């Protein structure tokens, strides 16, 4: 952030707020204990843990230094400043955003993992088969899952949707070269980084819940305001989270 601010051209470090949730996620995943916490349901012990306190306060200090004007609860609100204007150094937005990059910035933008070679990767709700169906329906459901995860469909996930396919047999580099699109080639590089990361952790909103995720992001957005007492705001957040989990 210091180097970018030193450019003196109104550039800034990163899009905070929604993106700050990713920073907490990655900091938690940097230790075995923290990673286990993120991958399980939120409990009172986790809320009161040193790992969570360190992750929140470290992120809050970064957000405060980055500036409250660069904070949003939806990255889409500031997306153009990364994809089109090139005003922001880092966008925490996953591998799927390649199609939004302006052609003039394609050469300048590079994918990267979090420090410690950590990647956040989730399949969202994923694909599941309901219980208590007939054998015939279960067989059809499994056939559908087999099709959806096939190379044929997953190639389209990469080239059309521009997301990281779940089928690791798909040759992303070959597809990217075949497309001839520079942004798609960067997408292939980003997917490879995620798939080969030393630590791959789930997005905490899928384990801790969207309400908890929103509460954490709101607290961080408040901490981004200069002069906010981070310790006091964290204590308030702990009470909010304990109320949410019952």
Sequence positions of predicted segments:
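Long, aromatic- and glycine/proline-rich binding clefts that accommodate carbohydrate-like moieties
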Residues: 159-218, 222
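Short, solvent-exposed loop/beta-turn-alpha elements that line the ligand-binding surface or hinge
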Residues: 13, 34-55, 103-104, 113-119, ...
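Pocket-flanking alpha-helical
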Residues: 1-11, 80, 97-104, 242
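Short helix-initiation/N-cap motifs at beta->coil->alpha
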Residues: 70-84
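Extracytoplasmic/periplasmic solute-binding protein
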Residues: 1-44, 88
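Glycine-centered hinge/linker elements that transmit conformational signals in sensory
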Residues: 2-3, 41-72
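Extracytoplasmic/periplasmic substrate-recognition and gating elements
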Residues: 103-164
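Paired acidic/hydrophobic, glycine-rich loop segments that form the ligand-binding mouth/hinge
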Residues: 89-94
């Amino acid at each position: 952030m210091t180097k970018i601010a030193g450019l003196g051209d109104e550039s800034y470090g990163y899009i905070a707020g929604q993106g700050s949730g990713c920073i907490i996620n990655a900091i938690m995943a940097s230790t075995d204990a923290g990673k286990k916490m993120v991958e399980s349901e939120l409990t009172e012990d986790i809320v009161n843990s040193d790992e969570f306190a360190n992750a929140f306060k470290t992120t809050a200090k970064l957000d405060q230094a980055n500036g409250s004007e660069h904070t949003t609860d939806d990255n889409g609100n500031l997306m153009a400043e990364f994809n089109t204007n090139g005003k922001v150094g880092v966008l925490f937005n996953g591998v799927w955003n390649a199609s939004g990059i302006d052609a003039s910035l394609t050469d300048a933008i590079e994918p990267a993992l979090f420090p410690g070679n950590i990647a956040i990767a989730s399949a969202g709700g994923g694909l599941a088969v309901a219980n208590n169906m007939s054998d015939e329906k279960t067989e059809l459901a499994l056939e559908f899952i087999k099709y959806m995860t096939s190379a044929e469909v997953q190639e389209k996930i990469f080239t059309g949707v521009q997301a990281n396919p779940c089928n690791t047999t798909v040759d992303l580099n070959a597809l990217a070269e075949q497309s001839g699109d520079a942004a798609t080639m960067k997408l292939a590089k980003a997917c490879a980084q995620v798939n080969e990361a030393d630590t791959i952790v789930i997005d905490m909103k899928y384990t801790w819940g969207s309400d908890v995720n929103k509460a954490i992001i709101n607290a961080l957005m408040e901490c981004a305001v200069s002069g906010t007492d981070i310790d006091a705001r964290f204590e308030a957040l702990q009470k909010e989270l304990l109320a949410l989990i019952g």
